[in-house]
Amino acid sequence: MSRQQPRASFLPESPLAPVALCDTTLRDGEQTAGVAFTRAEKRAIAEALQAAGVAEVEVGVPAMGEEERADIRAVAAVLKTAAPVVWCRLRAEDLAAAQRTGVVRLHIGVPVSERQISAKLGKDAAWVRDKVEKLVRAASWAGHKVSVGAEDASRADPFFLAEIAHVAAEAGAIRFRISDTLGVLDPFAAHELVGRVVTRCPLPVEFHGHNDLGMATANSLAAARAGASHLSVTVNGLGERAGNAALEEVAAALEAAGRATGVALGQLCALSELVARASGRPLSPQKPIVGEGVFTHECGIHVDGLMKDRATYESADLRPERFGRSHRIAIGKHSSAAGLARALAEAGLPADAATLAALMPALRDWAAITKRAAAPEDLAALLAAQTETAR
């Protein structure tokens, strides 16, 4: 008989177990170079996250000073169903600063790779173990709910990683976070790392992914598949360097996979637009889920298929209505004659065969020059120009 691997009691028995999303837009997202939120913006973002059903909101770093602590208190005051969380370094003074905010939940970031321990802290593994035990125990005794984050976990010794998880658990921590701080994992490595920790860690596991290789969303899904019960995200993927796993992408992908998140998908676009304005980071039209153009079709073959049966070019899990959106048919270089005829008719313009034959080449030239889709007024102008040329 084969021996079964030990299984933590919290490990989901079903691959469809729900996943809690922990948003860090107001902390890690604001660490994006050049991004800074006002207090009013922070409160508005926190309220929007709460309305969207996000489970936890990291609201700031108390050690930054009294102004930041005042912001944290103001933001925490509007959170009723979403739990506010503050972020601390592995320092007693950070814990003291956190206690002045009145926030119960706090997260302690712990460097766990040899490079970060020696170069950043100037310490060794024994010092880190001792510090984690003392600070987590002190915070727990003070009434805080403490999560511990393993920074640079993807480059850490796996045995030391497991050891820190056990030290944190014994000291009173409620969750253990695996941070791919440099964004170096791929989904296969993320699944392996998280799965290894989940089977050895006595705590629920959270995954925090960065997007340096463009795989933060995929890595987050792999982590959930491996047993992570919580995923760290930011709106629009804001974050240092290439950013973090995007809330809207992770929520949509998990729901499509049958994993409940508690997030109202129809709220994501408004939330995304709010953060885009507050951060000064406009969205790409092709940003998955929330970009202006992600439910727009121009290619004649695709448009023809959609008109006959939406399922030809649309997944049931990605119907625009799920996100409070609708389809848009764009007219441009790749439009078919039928699509152009439909657009002309809707604009009250002639759509006979002769008009289409004359207008199609002009439309393609116009699209190559203007680099955009044609609006009804553009079609009218093109038609007028063709009529004038024909005289």
Curated annotation (Swiss-Prot):
Q: Which GO terms describe its molecular function?
A: homocitrate synthase activity
The UniProt record lists the EC number as 2.3.3.14
Q: Which InterPro entries match?
A: AIPM/Hcit_synth_CS (IPR002034), Aldolase_TIM (IPR013785), LeuA/HCS_post-cat (IPR054691), NifV/FrbC (IPR013477), PYR_CT (IPR000891)
For the protein in the UniProt heading, the enzyme class is transferase
* Gene Ontology biological-process entries: biosynthetic process; carboxylic acid metabolic process; nitrogen fixation
Q: What keywords is this UniProt entry annotated with?
A: Nitrogen fixation, Transferase
| Pfam families attached to this UniProt entry | HCS_D2, HMGL-like
Query: Which cysteines does the record link by disulfide bonds?
Result: none
Q: Where would I find the Pyruvate carboxyltransferase domain in this sequence?
A: 19-269
Catalytic activity reported? acetyl-CoA + 2-oxoglutarate + H2O = (2R)-homocitrate + CoA + H(+)
Instruction: Reply yes or no: does the keyword Transferase apply.
Output: yes
Family in the record: Belongs to the alpha-IPM synthase/homocitrate synthase family.
| Described function | This protein is a Fe-Mo-cofactor biosynthetic component.
Name-wise, this protein is: Homocitrate synthase
Q: Give the gene symbol.
A: nifV
